[in-house]
Amino acid sequence: DAGFMYAAKMSGQSESYDFFTPDAGELAFLADELAPHPFYTRGFILHPNDNVPDLIRRAYQHQNAARYLLVKGESDYIVHKSQVVQKVDQPSFEAMEAIGGTGDTLTGLLSVLCGADFELTDAAVLSAGANRWSGHYADPSPATQVIELIEKIPQALVKVLNEHNGKNDNER
């Protein structure tokens, strides 16, 4: 979680971890080699969505990133050792930004898929996709509660796993 990423950065242990799942604001803290706490992050945070690749580069440059990053946002960036290997941006729902807990569902999906021995890049891509598809199936509004998305995770996982395995939605 975010608090643990902060502790890993400040202890110099970031590179010891397989994954961090920051949003753009949390990534700005990882990218700022001088900030001892997110409150002190320099101006990077003011334009977080249009400079994500630069923030990724800076976080790795200063050894403040895990081996993999799954940067959450309008587009989800899957990164391995400073290289963006994939972006997941569909389906997209503005309303999901207002739903508390979607980062937790993403982290949970990622943990499950890593625990199921998926290759780490695949686990990140699939979890980002499943999290987004759970939103699609829940048809979110700003009033949607995260439990409504959680209830759609099995359906979303079937979809992304079928696509990953080369099956269409009608095959089981």
Which residues does each PLM region occupy?
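Short, small-residue alpha-helix embedded
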Residues: 29, 99-130
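Short, well-structured alpha-helical segments that form the helix of a local strand-helix-strand
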Residues: 52-61, 119-135, 146-154
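Glycine-rich phosphate/pyrophosphate-binding loop at beta-loop-alpha junctions
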Residues: 24-26, 84-89, 96-98, 127-143
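Conserved beta-alpha-beta core of the PfkB/ribokinase-like small-molecule kinase fold
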Residues: 1-51
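Charged C-terminal helix
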Residues: 132-172
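Conserved phosphate-donor
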Residues: 52-97
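Fold-independent oxyanion-binding glycine-rich loops
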Residues: 1-3, 22-25, 30, 72-74, ...
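Gly/Ser/Thr-rich active-site loops/lids in small-molecule metabolic enzymes
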Residues: 45-50, 88-111
